[in-house]
Amino acid sequence: MNTSVDVVTKLIHLQNNVLDIMREVDQYLNSDTPDYTIESLNAPGKQFDFLDEMLTKKLIESNAIVFDEKSKNLKIIHNNINMCLNWCINLITIKHYVQ
């Protein structure tokens, strides 16, 4: 497989995963009160921990993608994905520690 095709495939896969996680982040940010269950009472911040772990894994995965110096457009896409991931991490962290 061509290197740039491989990078594009990785970026598309990563972008789709990030969009899915962003939906979960949106639900977390828009929830006024957590759903209290016996399980959630035993593990406070469980949803935050899950989202933080998933976002961090995707950030590490994103940073592992290697680009050719000539692939300026792919680098822009990659940087935008990283900005979204960092933005989501910041938002859930603020909500978690302010509540």
Curated annotation (Swiss-Prot):
Pfam families: DUF2682. SUPFAM superfamilies: BAG domain. This is Uncharacterized 11.5 kDa protein in IAP2-VLF1 intergenic region. It comes from Autographa californica nuclear polyhedrosis virus. The lineage of its organism: Viruses, Viruses incertae sedis, Naldaviricetes, Lefavirales, Baculoviridae.
